[in-house]
Amino acid sequence: MNTVRVTFLLVFVLAVSLGQADKDENRMEMQEKTEQGKSYLDFAENLLLQKLEELEAKLLEEDSEESRNSRQKRCIGEGVPCDENDPRCCFGLVCLKPTLHGIWYKSYYCYKK
């Protein structure tokens, strides 16, 4: 019975001592990994920041240029009355006083240039 107790005690002491060594090694590994992780996170953060700055530059460039798809808003078509002080005739039209057939209306109309 003593032999079993001694054997058990010996195994217990070995397990505890080896467990402590593993614990220290694990702690050191975790510190190394966190340091590597921090450097990786810094690298990833810088890369993401560069990409965001590039996207922002592209967006600002697109905003400054006139888009091909943009159109004039609320323009007045041909033959429609307009205000001589604030003409809103569509592109290619001019706000002019009518000739002959529209004289009695006393208003300006949008005509082709």
Swiss-Prot record:
Signal sequence interval, chain numbering: 1-21
Task performed by this protein: Weakly inhibits Kv1.2/KCNA2, Kv1.3/KCNA3, Kv2.1/KCNB1 voltage-gated potassium channels, and Nav1.5/SCN5A voltage-gated sodium channels.
Species whose genome carries this gene: Cyriopagopus hainanus (Chinese bird spider)
InterPro entries from the UniProt entry: Toxin_22
Compartment(s) where it occurs, according to its Swiss-Prot or TrEMBL record: Secreted
Keywords associated with the record: Disulfide bond, Ion channel impairing toxin, Knottin, Potassium channel impairing toxin, Secreted, Signal, Toxin, Voltage-gated potassium channel impairing toxin, Voltage-gated sodium channel impairing toxin
A Pfam family it matches: Toxin_22
Keyword Transferase belongs to the record: no
Origin superkingdom: Eukaryota
Bridged cysteine pairs (disulfide): 75-90, 82-95, 89-110
Pro-peptide region(s): 22-74
Region of interest (Disordered), residue spans: 61-82
Key word Signal present: yes
Domain comment as written in the entry: The presence of a 'disulfide through disulfide knot' structurally defines this protein as a knottin.
Protein name (record): U11-theraphotoxin-Hhn1v
Tissue specificity field: Expressed by the venom gland.
One Gene Ontology MF term: potassium channel regulator activity
Family as reported in the entry's similarity comment: Belongs to the neurotoxin 14 (magi-1) family. 01 (HNTX-16) subfamily.
GO cellular component: extracellular region
